[in-house]
Amino acid sequence: MIDDDKAIMMLEKALEEAQKLLEHTDDFYPFALILHHDSTIKRLEQKCDDDIEESYLMLHDVLIDYVHDHPTTDIVVLVTQTTMPKVIVQEDGIRSSIRIHLEEQSQQTKAIASRYIYVPYQRVTSDIGTPTLHLLNPQAISFPSEFFPKKR
């Protein structure tokens, strides 16, 4: 599988899991999916009492250490529920979003190696009362790597 295909697969897995979680609750604890060179996927989460923001920060730090300790790490996605930044909100004005922080080891030679991918959503209830999530067009913001050490 080529690097782009791996990244898309990880994005799809992360988004699918977040969508399922949000169909059953108003929010969820952040989680990470990690793809290794041998194609194994590891899921991590870090729960800090009832504090979702603190859980995110703790998980972020755990991922930095994890990538350092596991050189076979290929791709990291860190997923959380958040509000979209005003600068990228689309015309519909929807700000509720799933944010996927994507980093790939193969991109570390580039100046901007990481992306936040915001996927806005609307919670919709069907005629029979079943909640579903309607996902809208994603928006991406690029920034320097946080998890992988910079390659030169």
Residue ranges and their predicted role:
Residues 92-152:
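Glycine-rich, aromatic-bearing surface loops/beta-hairpins
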Residues 50-72:
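A broadly used, surface-exposed interaction patch
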Residues 66-111:
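Terminal interaction module
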Residues 16-21, 46-48, 61-66, 83-88:
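Short secondary-structure capping micro-motifs at structural edges
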Residues 9-14, 22, 55-58, 77-80:
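A short linear-motif detector with a strong N-terminal bias
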Residues 1-44:
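Long, hydrophobic N-terminal alpha-helical segment
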Residues 24, 36-37, 60, 68-70, ...:
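Histidine (H) residue identity feature
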